[in-house]
Amino acid sequence: MSQNSLVIRNATIVDGTGIEPFKGDVAIENGIIKEIGNVEDIYNNEIDAKGKILAPGFIDIHTHFDPQLCWDGYATPSIEHGVTTVVTGNCSLSLAPIKNGGQDKIISMFQVIEDIKKPTFDAAVPFSWETFGEYLDHIKPNLGINVGALIGHSAVRLYVMGEDSQKRKATDEEIREMCDIVEKSMESGALGVSSSYVDVDENFDPVPSRFSCKKEKIELARAATKTGRGVWQVVPYFIDMETQLKNIEELGDISLETGIMCTFQPVLSTPDAPKAEQIMAALQKERDRGAKVFGQTMPRCFDLNMRLSETSMLLFGMPTWKAIMDLPIDERKKSFADNEKQKILIEEAKNAQGMSAALPMLKVGDVYSKQNEIYKGKYLVEICETEGKDIGQVILDIALADDLKTEFQLMDVINSDKESVSYLIMNELCHFGASDAGAHITQFCGTGDTTHLLEHYVRDTKKISLSTAIHRMTQEVANDWGLHDRGVIQNGKAADLVLFDINEVGISKEAFVNDFPGEASRYMRYSKGYEAVIVNGSVVYDNNGYTDARSGKIV
């Protein structure tokens, strides 16, 4: 369909403001909403939306689609879940600025932190740019979805300081150079800056942003606001609560010094802190100080899949396991099968700490050999007891029989208390976000949280009203993130819209598919119930799947 003229008739309109739904038509011309109500004019293209919900397109504020947008301008499967705008470049990582040779370090950080592999980069990410603006120019022509792109603090630091970016504080001159890059990037269309207090690189050394002082962060945030907008996104040191609370306080200082909106994720419900009480109290303290600091929370359980053929953050805490997981697949198989190495691996698994301590909570998912069929759906602790084996031995025996492809699942542990999750989703101290879509792709699919919210929390359990859910996914984040030209169905706003059947909308189980460049695999979550997704006036997805429209913009 052309974006020149379109009318959607007889819709139940949920306009994003939080008011009650109302019936009406919406007319679009040249990508802009022209009329709402009883549209009498005849348009080139018309959609009958009787019995369907028409809402603003959803905004996903935490994604890592930076590489994927080089070959997939739809950021699949985001659009089929009603998402019309994604924010990329989170957690201090972006693909620009970059100097010749600098891509190797960027790739290695993306591999470890975001689980996007080097063969994928080699096959589909050309690194034909240097500046952030040049990267945006590279992805623009192919966009079917809107992109709000953050500049990665680690990328900027690496560009200016090289190897020293992971050794020391920046000098005043280096800070000025970084600020100049941020200003120029913002002028080229960037949305803000991202940083990290917790991430590590391929050598388990802190990423460049973690070597910055508060002065550097404040100056970069101030540079980002010179265009009249800007956000400062971080991932805190969530491993230790005391440190995380200090991070939140520093965000408050940055906001108060510069006026920038600061945001961090994830804020999750855990068994020992169902409503994230300490974090929410820290957020309230900063709000009381006058700082603009928001958490990000999500509706789904934070479930993880582990395959020894891929990557797993559950193994990072065990050095021998981690070292073997870093090997090419053929060497990895030999190492895991080696009797002497197995003794070390089994001992490490017995004494696992951090995220690796969750290994006993795993159960067996998909299997690929006949002998492993008896284990499907069973918890590893159950198998250990039945067979008299240690946890490490059970994992190795099962995985080796499947050529390392066995799926081990960690489910219903984090963010599983639905009452507490409802509280967090509804709390004004948090934004709806933290999906991590486009990252950790061999461990989970972050895309689809929008559909899960509608299906479970709005329709099935009625814990959240439809108007409130839509408002939280659209106008609220659009306003706070500086996307003032969209996020609401109003005359003169961008025609980013989603049409769906609330009685049919739903999400599939995760599927492990092999569709990434470089023969890489990823988890996907498919949707149902979406009749049309419209980006800047053009239908990019309908009942027949994706169209050929490329109407996305840098926002």
Set out the residue ranges of the language-model regions.
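Acidic, glycine-enriched loop/beta-strand segments at the rims
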Residues: 14-25, 407-415, 421, 465-470, ...
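Di-metal (Zn2+ and/or Mg2+/Mn2+) metal-binding site signature of metallo-dependent hydrolases
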Residues: 54-77
